[in-house]
């Protein structure tokens, strides 16, 4: 079974790389990067501090800070006062940021639909269920 897990992990890494490259192409067609797209997406539901966004994305705070600064300069997001933390403002999308996110998301839906056509829906759901169980198991092992 460990050989099967190792092969699955290799496939997941390969797929993740392909999805990252595909995401870069999708975002680039709207004149943006995947890093911008990810940060726009993660703060689209509610305002977050840069450290909160970094934790959600699983990346460094410094990397997110650079992208957040870029979004602010481009008028896609703004920093607002955080009543819970004087020195860590909240990153909030502007209307322009929401429009850009929507445009990128619409392009991504086209790509996702093509991917969905390549896989049986039941097999896709079973795969996702298995991956979620593995994620839960790995999180439980964390010290």
UniProtKB/Swiss-Prot annotation:
Gene Ontology BP, a term: response to stress
Signal sequence, renumbered to the chain: 1-27
Coiled-coil residue spans: none
InterPro entries, per the entry: HTH_MarR-typ (IPR000835), MarR/SlyA-like (IPR039422), WH-like_DNA-bd_sf (IPR036388), WH_DNA-bd_sf (IPR036390)
A Pfam family per the record: MarR_2
Molecular function (Gene Ontology), one example: DNA-binding transcription factor activity
Lineage top rank: taxon: Bacteria
Keywords, alphabetical: Signal
Protein name per the record: Uncharacterized protein Rv2011c
Lineage: Bacteria, Bacillati, Actinomycetota, Actinomycetes, Mycobacteriales
